């Protein structure tokens, strides 16, 4: 059963943070790549700390072993210096899919007994 095996590693490009550059009077989009470097199929979901300012497309999906997906992280226009951006980040959550399951995202796979792993990517805003 896949749920008893801890999920393997993923890689992200960039690996540690996402950087947006001023001006912030228009929407910015930054692409990141998520790679399933494990030997099992995983399901992933992306969370943001500021849903008003940050968006991710696609926000969830399923990746086969060694498969990658390109995500568009968007930052809507905002008043730089007048809003708190210190804690902005996106979090990639992932877990193994059950053995024999269809390659289709299911939210309940995150709510079962299996381990869910997380990787935080802080957002840096350059003035």
Curated annotation (Swiss-Prot):
Disulfide bonds: none
Chain positions found as N-acetylalanine: 2
InterPro entries, alphabetized: Ig-like_fold, MSP_dom, Nematode_MSP, PapD-like_sf
Keywords linked to the UniProt accession: Acetylation, Cell projection, Cytoplasm, Cytoskeleton
Gene3D superfamilies referenced in this protein's UniProt entry, alphabetically: Immunoglobulins (2.60.40.10)
Pfam families xref list: Motile_Sperm
PROSITE patterns associated with the record: MSP (PS50202)
Domain MSP span(s) in chain numbering: 9-126
Tissues where this protein is expressed: Sperm.
SUPFAM superfamilies: PapD-like
Top-level division of the source organism's lineage: Eukaryota
Location(s) in or outside the cell: Cell projection, Pseudopodium; Cytoplasm, Cytoskeleton
One Gene Ontology term, aspect cellular component: pseudopodium
Functional note: Central component in molecular interactions underlying sperm crawling. Forms an extensive filament system that extends from sperm villipoda, along the leading edge of the pseudopod.
PANTHER family referenced in this protein's UniProt entry, alphabetically: MAJOR SPERM PROTEIN, MSP DOMAIN-CONTAINING PROTEIN-RELATED
Miscellaneous: Around 30 MSP isoforms may exist in C.elegans.
Protein name: Major sperm protein 55/57
Organism, as annotated: Caenorhabditis elegans
Gene name of this polypeptide: msp-55
């Amino acid at each position: 059963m896949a749920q008893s095996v801890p999920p393997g590693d993923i890689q992200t490009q960039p690996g540690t943070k996402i950087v947006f550059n001023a001006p912030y009077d228009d929407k910015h989009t930054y692409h990141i790549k998520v790679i399933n470097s494990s030997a099992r199929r995983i399901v992933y979901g992306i969370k943001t700390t500021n849903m008003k300012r940050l968006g991710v497309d696609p926000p969830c999906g399923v990746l086969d072993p060694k498969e990658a997906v390109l995500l568009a992280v968007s930052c809507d226009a905002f008043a730089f210096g007048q809003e708190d951006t210190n804690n902005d980040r996106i979090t990639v959550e992932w877990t193994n899919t059950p053995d024999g399951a269809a390659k289709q995202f299911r939210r309940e796979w995150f709510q079962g007994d299996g381990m869910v792993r997380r990787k935080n990517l802080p957002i840096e805003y350059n003035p």
